[in-house]
């Protein structure tokens, strides 16, 4: 069975949900921006965690373009939208930078800008 040309990605924030189509070679943040959805981001390199989201399903995201992404991040369902490429249909809770920074601190992993994590 061949891979689909695009994946459905549902972006969740509060009580709002927006669905976009994202090709496997496109970063999720870029596809959202093209669709008129402005998500948090700063470095666009997968380092600062500003773009962090969290999977709300068992989807798969390729984070090979990320400067810092750890197995613990994947296990906890965190994704970096600015460098993540979909490998399946996804449901992602956006605006998760604070939660990801707190998680990283709890695992003694680098958490840039973690003074904002509480």
Q: What is each of the regions a protein language model found here?
A:
Residues 12, 21-27, 51-56, 62-67, ...:
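N-terminal start-of-chain detector that recognizes signal peptides
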Residues 1-4, 87, 93-118:
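Iron-sulfur (Fe-S) cluster-binding modules
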Residues 42-49:
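Cysteine-centered iron-sulfur cluster-binding motifs in ferredoxin-type domains/subunits
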Residues 1-39:
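N-terminal pre-ligand scaffold of iron-sulfur
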């Amino acid at each position: 069975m061949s891979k689909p040309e695009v994946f459905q990605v549902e972006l969740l924030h509060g009580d709002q949900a927006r669905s976009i189509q994202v090709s496997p070679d496109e970063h999720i943040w870029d596809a959202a921006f093209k669709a008129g959805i402005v998500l948090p981001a700063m470095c666009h390199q997968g380092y600062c965690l500003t773009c962090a989201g969290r999977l709300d399903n068992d989807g798969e995201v390729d984070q090979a373009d990320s400067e810092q992404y750890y197995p613990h991040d994947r296990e906890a369902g965190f994704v970096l939208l600015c460098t993540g490429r979909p490998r399946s249909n996804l449901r992602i809770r956006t605006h998760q930078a604070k939660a990801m920074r707190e998680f990283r601190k709890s695992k003694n992993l680098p958490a840039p800008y973690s003074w904002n994590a509480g």
